[in-house]
């Protein structure tokens, strides 16, 4: 097997100062059997349950500085982890809406927190009329999520993605994977010290809006919660963020009988965004649907391309939570930004089929095939997906580019070796960073499966 070493430089906001602890906002709870759940079909781990003072949290967050205009924060918030402990984070408001939309819906907020107790942890969370939802990324443990589990939005469960059982019917991504028109070149490093911001238009069906209460504000709150998490992964892996356009609420439909969507979601979304928003006014478009579990990006790498950039959709019977956000939405938008499927159970001829079985990263099919190696996708992209997306967006011009000032780290995976099958081995790598940032590493298989390594043999032989 061939391996490449992927070095990940976490985006770090420096010179943050300490403020008082606001841990009293969260209190451990034993209310596990008396809950009135948001949706009885949602099955979440409930070993660690907390009560949240939501109004107190809102008040505590009022002083959080805006991330894009400040490098310092005295706002410190505690967030419970899956071990039942409270972890402190230095918090910035991190709106994923353009200013006009954010001003129209001031109760819908997004934030990012930089770990104090664990400096390698980054929390992405949203606060809205739908409550509190979070995702904490850390290189030394499984991604952790917080979800409301009571209808009054006072009780929350904290869990690791690795501990969650998949209660969904299989998800089908029906996008047709195509090889890149020109060969993908190996780059020295995917990072070029540029943050790329794309204007995002998200539409929804009437059924989706009804699921969250039936108003545009509630639909937007749900979209904001999902995209806060998706943005967290895209920022961490691609240095890409998406911002909902100022008039995004024009394409939020609350009546299933009159919305412009039937079943031809790809073409109907593209037509809707072209006519209602205008091709010059967004960079990538997506549709959220409450229906059967499936999705289709409409194209590969078509962000910024008029006539096709607004043709992706994600559909689920339960269009909320980490499975919807990470396994489904991030997967389909990943296609739109240029990533192909990474599983090896089937060889699609793109050069990306590198992961054993159905895969374990976002562009795989974790948990939904007969060649599964795990139940759900890990909340990150495979090294080849990162290469595909970053190569693609570096050739785009529709986005806004912002220099990060972050020095590009270097990684050394050592010499290449060929060893017999089933031989034990140990991998040793190294890296350097001119800024002195702590680097994290991830070893991944980096050769695409041959025709004899697909199907039932993919998990065992890859």
What spans do the regions from the language model cover?
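N-terminal prosegments of processed precursors
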Residues: 20-150, 265-268
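Short, solvent-exposed loop/linker segments at the N-terminal edge
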Residues: 417-425
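Extracellular acidic, Ser/Thr/Pro-rich low-complexity tracts
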Residues: 419, 430-435, 447
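The catalytic-center signature of Zn2+-dependent metalloproteases
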Residues: 245-267, 305-380, 453
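Bacterial Sec-dependent N-terminal signal peptides
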Residues: 1-24
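Exoplasmic/lumenal beta-rich domain surfaces
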Residues: 243, 442-462
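Proline/serine/threonine-rich low-complexity linkers at boundaries of modular beta-sandwich domains
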Residues: 393-410
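Fold-level signature of zinc-dependent metallopeptidase catalytic domains
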Residues: 21-26, 30-36, 154-301
């Amino acid at each position: 097997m061939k391996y490449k070493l992927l070095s990940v430089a976490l985006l770090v906001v420096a010179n943050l100062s300490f403020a008082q602890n606001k841990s009293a906002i969260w209190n451990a709870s034993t209310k596990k059997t008396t809950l009135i759940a948001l949706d009885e079909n949602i099955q979440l781990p409930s070993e660690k349950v907390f009560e949240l003072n939501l109004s107190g949290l809102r008040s505590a967050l009022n002083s959080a500085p805006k991330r894009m205009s400040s490098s310092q924060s005295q706002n410190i918030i505690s967030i419970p982890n899956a071990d039942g402990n409270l972890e402190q984070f230095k918090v910035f408001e991190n709106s994923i809406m353009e200013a006009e939309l954010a001003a129209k819906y001031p109760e819908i907020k997004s934030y990012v927190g930089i770990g104090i107790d664990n400096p390698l942890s980054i929390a992405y969370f949203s606060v809205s009329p739908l409550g509190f939802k979070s995702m904490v990324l850390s290189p030394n443990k499984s991604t952790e999520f917080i979800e409301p589990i009571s209808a009054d939005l006072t009780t929350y469960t904290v869990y690791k993605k690795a501990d969650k059982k998949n209660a969904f019917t299989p998800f089908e991504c029906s996008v047709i994977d195509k090889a890149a028109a020109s060969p993908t070149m190996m780059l020295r490093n995917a990072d070029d010290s540029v943050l790329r911001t794309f204007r995002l238009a998200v539409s929804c069906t009437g059924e989706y809006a009804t699921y969250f209460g039936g108003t545009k504000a509630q639909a937007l709150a749900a979209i904001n919660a999902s995209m806060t998490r998706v943005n967290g992964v895209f920022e961490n892996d691609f240095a890409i963020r998406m911002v909902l356009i100022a008039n995004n609420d024009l394409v939020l439909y609350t009546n299933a009988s009159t919305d412009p969507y039937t079943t031809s979601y790809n073409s109907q979304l593209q037509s809707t965004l072209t006519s209602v928003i205008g091709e010059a006014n967004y960079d990538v478009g997506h549709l959220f649907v409450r229906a059967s579990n499936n999705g289709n990006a409409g194209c590969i790498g078509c962000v910024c391309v008029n006539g096709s950039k607004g043709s992706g959709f994600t559909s689920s019977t339960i269009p909320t939570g980490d499975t919807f956000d990470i396994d489904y939405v991030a997967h389909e938008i990943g296609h739109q930004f240029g990533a192909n499927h990474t599983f090896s159970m089937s060889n699609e001829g793109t050069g990306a089929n590198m992961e054993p079985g159905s895969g374990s990263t976002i562009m795989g099919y974790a948990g939904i095939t007969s060649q599964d190696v795990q139940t759900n996708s890990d909340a990150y992209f495979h090294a080849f997906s990162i290469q595909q997306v970053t190569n693609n967006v570096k050739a785009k011009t529709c986005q806004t580019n912002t220099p990060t000032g972050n020095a590009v780290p270097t990684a050394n995976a050592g010499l290449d070796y060929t060893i017999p099958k089933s031989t034990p081995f140990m991998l040793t790598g190294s890296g350097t960073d001119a800024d002195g940032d702590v680097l994290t590493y991830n070893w991944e298989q980096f050769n695409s499966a041959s025709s004899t390594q697909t199907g039932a043999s993919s998990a065992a032989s890859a």
